[in-house]
A protein has these predicted regions:
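Extended Lys/Arg-rich, glycine-bearing segments that form polyanion-binding/interaction patches
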Residues: 100-124, 132
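Active-site glycine-rich loop that binds ribose-phosphate moieties when present
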Residues: 115-128, 149, 153-158
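A glycine-rich beta-to-alpha transition motif near the start of alpha/beta enzyme domains, typified by
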Residues: 1-110, 140-266
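Short, flexible, solvent-exposed loop/turn segments with mixed acidic/basic and small polar residues
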Residues: 5-7, 128-132
């Protein structure tokens, strides 16, 4: 079978996007999804997204990890599929889509996409680390000099421990750059190991949101905008905290079409 595809990236987190409004893509064939995502035998991507029709919003987003399995919310993927919907002429400069965790609003401004995320009402603290759900599950650990950490090795100790091994968890290591005066504007730097990809990715949208909220929790911030540096580029997260609940959470950053083409799936 042959399909048209579009390759997008949001701060280095890359995705294959397919217009599946005619429901022709065989979603039950996880092997095909895995093949498309393979960087040697397919197109190569962190995940695959299908854009489909829905009566609840402008469109529906269906997201698969690189391992071929349908997964939870992907923030950078949400920003990229919003840009794709505009390319298809389905929306103009704003709209909504239905994802696995509910309805998301988005705003498109030139190359940037702002995406509203779900509210977060609980952050668990385990010693000095944080566990929370921002559409996907995340483990956040503040460390020093994270570029010296073997991310894959260290993250797998957490991702595959007896607590998280069954469902999996994304693991984020975070460094406060303002703490050692490398940055004057309070930026923080993060690296992420993603379940389903089972490797470090250049960026993670739901992870960026998780890190921003943990930074806010750690520093008693009730509202504001946190600038975050990832290996793939800059993202920002704005939020308001009402009591113990984080609301009005917006993830912002670039989303770009890299190339498009057709692929034959055997």
């Amino acid at each position: 079978m042959q399909f048209n595809f579009y390759k997008y990236q949001g701060t280095g987190n890359d995705f294959v996007v397919i217009d599946n409004r005619n429901l022709s893509f065989p979603k039950e064939n996880h092997g095909w999804v895995k093949q498309i995502c393979d960087r040697r035998f397919g197109i190569g991507t962190d995940g695959l997204m299908l854009l489909e029709n829905t009566t609840d919003a402008d469109f529906k987003m269906v997201y698969y990890n690189a391992d071929g399995n349908e997964s939870t919310m992907c923030g950078n993927g949400g920003r990229c599929i919003s840009a794709f919907a505009k390319k298809l002429g389905m929306v103009s400069d704003n709209g909504t889509f239905l994802a696995i965790d509910g309805i998301h609003e988005f705003i498109l401004k030139e190359a940037d996409v702002q995406l509203k995320m779900i509210n977060v009402d609980k952050i668990n603290i385990e010693k000095d680390d944080y566990i929370l759900f921002t559409g996907s599950p995340h483990y956040v650990s503040f460390r020093n000099e994270i570029d010296k950490i073997d991310i894959v090795s260290e993250a797998r100790k957490i991702r595959y421990n007896e607590i998280y091994s069954k469902e999996g968890i994304n693991v984020n290591f975070v460094e406060d750059l303002s703490a050692d005066r490398q940055e004057k504007d309070g930026k923080i730097y993060m690296r992420t190991y993603e379940r389903g990809v089972e490797d470090e990715t250049l960026s993670c949208g739901t992870g960026t949101v998780a890190v921003a909220l943990c930074f806010a929790e750690k520093n008693n911030l009730e509202k504001g905008k946190v600038e975050i540096l990832t290996p793939g580029g800059n993202l920002s997260v704005s939020f308001t905290k009402e009591g113990s609940i984080f609301t009005n959470i917006w993830l912002q950053g670039a989303a770009k079409l890299v190339f498009q083409g057709t692929i034959d799936i055997d």
